[in-house]
């Protein structure tokens, strides 16, 4: 499938149209950003690692009965995906306290959250992705109650699948972000799942193995991503 015109350029991915109006090409770049794009750096191999990581995870979720936009792996840094009508709200599942939750509530980083928390954020970089809730979604018409309920159901199902996958590899799935869209009226998981949009800690050392290494200037970003990929069985080379 040949990519045609650039449709959208995000912080780390570029989206292209194809000759099929229902299919797009996602290109994963080497860019890494923090602070809503205020800080951007390039890391060799990052686009390839995230692309293959995402394809692997989406395949696992499909096997578990979670519909995703994934069609096929095209190259080291490109995948073919279904064109979704994206919901402007993203879902976050939290198994342990970290990131904005710690800042917002003043709680200790790393405490277990049982049952896991489910948060919603409006996708708006200019407004720093403000936190919203179900009533906002209904009032502003961002997503129907039925589709939002399905998004929540699929987010928790993904959490069950991925917590076990990472847990078996000696990793803690601390939290993660999911984005959904509609394809022929069905709620489908879109965007990506990678260490860019999740927090993953080593079970033994609690070392951070995700984009917090970049956000907090810890170094070793790609080495951490590749280590996580290796542990869960992603074939990179």
UniProtKB/Swiss-Prot annotation:
GO terms of biological process kind: 'de novo' IMP biosynthetic process; cobalamin biosynthetic process
GO cellular component, as recorded: cytosol
Catalytic activity: 5-amino-1-(5-phospho-D-ribosyl)imidazole-4-carboxylate + L-aspartate + ATP = (2S)-2-[5-amino-1-(5-phospho-beta-D-ribosyl)imidazole-4-carboxamido]succinate + ADP + phosphate + 2 H(+)
Pathway annotation: Purine metabolism; IMP biosynthesis via de novo pathway; 5-amino-1-(5-phospho-D-ribosyl)imidazole-4-carboxamide from 5-amino-1-(5-phospho-D-ribosyl)imidazole-4-carboxylate: step 1/2
Domain of life: Bacteria
UniProt cross-references to InterPro entries, sorted A to Z: SAICAR_synt/ADE2_N, SAICAR_synt_PurC, SAICAR_synth, SAICAR_synthetase, SAICAR_synthetase_CS
A Pfam family reported for this protein in Swiss-Prot or TrEMBL: SAICAR_synt
Molecular functions (GO terms): ATP binding; phosphoribosylaminoimidazolesuccinocarboxamide synthase activity
Transmembrane domains' residue ranges: none
Gene3D superfamilies cross-referenced by the UniProt entry: ATP-grasp fold, B domain (3.30.470.20), Phosphorylase Kinase, domain 1 (3.30.200.20)
Keywords assigned by UniProt, alphabetized: ATP-binding, Ligase, Nucleotide-binding, Purine biosynthesis
EC assignment: 6.3.2.6
Assigned protein family: Belongs to the SAICAR synthetase family.
Protein name: Phosphoribosylaminoimidazole-succinocarboxamide synthase
Species per Swiss-Prot/TrEMBL record: Pectobacterium atrosepticum (strain SCRI 1043 / ATCC BAA-672) (Erwinia carotovora subsp. atroseptica)
């Amino acid at each position: 499938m040949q990519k045609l015109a650039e449709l959208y350029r995000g912080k780390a991915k570029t989206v292209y149209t194809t000759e099929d109006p229902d299919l797009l090409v996602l290109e994963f770049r080497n860019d890494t950003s923090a602070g809503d794009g205020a800080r951007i750096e390039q890391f060799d191999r990052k686009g390839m690692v995230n692309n293959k990581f995402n394809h692997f995870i989406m395949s696992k979720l499909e096997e578990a009965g979670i519909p995703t936009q994934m069609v096929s792996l095209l190259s080291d840094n490109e995948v073919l995906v279904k064109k979704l009508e994206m919901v402007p709200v993203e879902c976050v599942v939290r198994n342990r306290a970290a990131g904005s939750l710690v800042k917002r509530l003043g709680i200790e980083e790393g405490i277990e959250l049982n049952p896991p928390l489910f948060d919603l954020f409006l996708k708006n970089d200019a407004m720093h992705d403000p936190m919203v809730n179900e009533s906002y979604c209904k009032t502003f018409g961002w997503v129907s109650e039925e589709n939002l309920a399905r998004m929540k159901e699929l987010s928790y199902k993904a959490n069950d699948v991925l917590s076990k996958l990472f847990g078996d590899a000696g990793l803690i799935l601390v939290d993660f972000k999911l984005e959904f869209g509609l394809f022929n009226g069905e709620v489908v998981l879109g965007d990506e799942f990678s260490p860019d949009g999740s927090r993953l800690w080593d079970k033994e050392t609690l070392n951070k193995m995700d984009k917090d290494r970049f956000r907090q200037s810890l170094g070793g970003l790609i080495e951490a991503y590749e280590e996580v990929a290796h542990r869960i069985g992603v074939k990179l080379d």
